[in-house]
Amino acid sequence: MTNIRKSHPLMKIVNNAFIDLPAPSNISSWWNFGSLLGICLILQILTGLFLAMHYTADTATAFSSVTHICRDVNYGWIIRYMHANGASMFFICLFMHVGRGLYYGSYTFLETWNIGVILLFATMATAFMGYVLPWGQMFFWGATVITNLLSAIPYIGTNLVXWILGGFXMDKATLTRFFAXHXILPFMIAALAXMHLXFXXETGSNNPPGISSDADKIPFHPYYTIKDILGALLLILALMLLVLFAPDLLGDPDNYTPANPLNTPPHIKPEWYFLFAYAILRSIPNKLGGVLALVLSILILILMPLLHTSKQRSMMFRPISQCLFWILVADLLTLTWIGGQPVEHPYIIIGQLASIMYFLLILVLMPVTSNIENNLLKW
């Protein structure tokens, strides 16, 4: 008799994706982030569900309802901070996951990679809309600034902004629609994640040296299930340390002031995970140019398969490319730092140089270096 795990129409899908999946024997901890992202998504949907039970999407009561959750709802404070800091953990895992893909050449799985880029955009959109909901000062002004960027689009820009905001300014209509869209997007992300997984399972995982692992496969369970559980425990440990010891470390003090359309904060900045893109946006003095650079800074990921000139897939045996990769990481950290600084003398020029460096590294230096490495190896 066949095992029910392998014959049942639903169970065999789970079996082929998480139990009997043939996995390379040599994948490192950098391959843990996919499962961690899944855990983050489930955690965000669950905490979000409980928050939505007590939250009111109305300009008059939104701020008070969040305060009420923290003060009066049983364990409301921990649910709220797990949701807020869960987003930070989500983005840390996302950046690590994308960085792994860049380093080990995983972008040669085109469908998986492209769905991944769409997932990144969807997650950023969700985080942005969720950011507005507590209706604090920085939430309000951050959203006002970012939505107004759309007015830079020629011909339709101004109408588009008014259409998204549901009026001339951020108001009750905006808050309601952002809440609705923030509630539905995570489920679209979950559906996309399943597609991402289906395509990844179709080709099999990549591995550190970037070579075929068909000759040496091991079952996903128990080897990688136990490894993923360890990763999950470390993720939850990090999240709970943040939630219980420094819940506001990554937030902005301005958000403890209710939104006031008549009072602009001195330095408007988004959450830390958008700062690198915000720095690129600010470093270009032209509005439309800035918006284009902002979108391209993430959309450039789609070009990665086209920019791959090396005869080797992974960077494991390419020391010069490795140097450039880590320079790119340092550059992104610099941009993140600059995005949180005021627009004044030393920061402006540093931001502009870091932005130029970002595009130069990806579009010019890395492909050229790959060619040089091919020649050095006489390939």
From Swiss-Prot:
* Key words, A-Z: Electron transport, Heme, Iron, Membrane, Metal-binding, Mitochondrion, Mitochondrion inner membrane, Respiratory chain, Transmembrane, Transmembrane helix, Transport, Ubiquinone
Q: Which cofactor does it need?
A: heme b
Where is the major localization of this protein?
A: mitochondrion
Residues involved in heme b b566 binding: 97, 196
Gene Ontology cellular-component terms listed: mitochondrial inner membrane; respiratory chain complex III
What Pfam families would the database entry show? Cytochrom_B_C, Cytochrome_B
Q: Identify the InterPro entries for this entry.
A: Cyt_b/b6_C, Cyt_b/b6_C_sf, Cyt_b/b6_N, Cytb/b6-like_sf, Cytochrome_b, Cytochrome_b_C_euk/bac, Cytochrome_b_N_euk/bac, Di-haem_cyt_TM
| Cofactor info, note text | Binds 2 heme b groups non-covalently.
Complexes and interactors: The cytochrome bc1 complex contains 11 subunits: 3 respiratory subunits (MT-CYB, CYC1 and UQCRFS1), 2 core proteins (UQCRC1 and UQCRC2) and 6 low-molecular weight proteins (UQCRH/QCR6, UQCRB/QCR7, UQCRQ/QCR8, UQCR10/QCR9, UQCR11/QCR10 and a cleavage product of UQCRFS1). This cytochrome bc1 complex then forms a dimer.
Report the sequence similarity comment from the record. Answer: Belongs to the cytochrome b family.
Q: Protein name, please?
A: Cytochrome b
Q: Can you name the source organism?
A: Litocranius walleri
